[in-house]
Amino acid sequence: LETLNSLLHPRVAEDYKGWLATHRHEKYVLREAALCYEIGLSRSVDKMIVVSAPEDIRIKRVIARDAHRTKEDIQAIIKNQLPEEEKVKRADYIIYNDNHHMVIPQVLHLHASFISGEISVHRQHIS
């Protein structure tokens, strides 16, 4: 896995730089990455949005999406990730995806705040 990541991540990063350059005039851009904190991407963005859900819900969703994965497989993956509580603690913004909060209104609120300038958001710099 390490070898694959060492080959893949530089190419993905290079592709992203090109994409970002073509969108440099946008008010803001988003970058999705499941392991932002773990692989250091959090240092290359201005703000972090964490989508948070309890572990039991995350496990159920992965099993529904990837029927070949067992609960134990998923728990092993989660164990190698930064704890959810730490991600939430480090986040600038949190979207709760826990079956108790409606996700779309949270997203629309952030979008409106970013567009209006109510929340200061700087574009990423291409390094």
Please identify what each model-predicted range represents.
Residues 5, 62, 107:
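Short, flexible helix/strand-to-coil boundary loops that buttress conserved ligand/catalytic motifs
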Residues 38-39, 57, 103:
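Short glycine-rich, flexible loops that bind phosphorylated cofactors or substrates
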Residues 1-28:
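ATP-dependent small-molecule kinase phosphotransfer cores
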Residues 28-38:
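Switch II (G3) loop of P-loop NTPases
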Residues 33-34, 52-53, 98:
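Glycine-rich, N-terminal phosphate-binding loop of Rossmann-like dinucleotide-binding domains
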Residues 18-20, 37-40, 83-85:
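Short, flexible, glycine/charge-rich loop motifs used to bind or transfer phosphoryl groups or to couple energy/partner
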Residues 30, 42-65:
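Conserved phosphate-donor/acceptor-positioning beta-strand/loop module used by diverse small-molecule
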Residues 12, 24, 43-44, 65-116, ...:
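Small-molecule kinase domains that catalyze NTP-dependent phosphoryl transfer to phosphate-bearing small molecules
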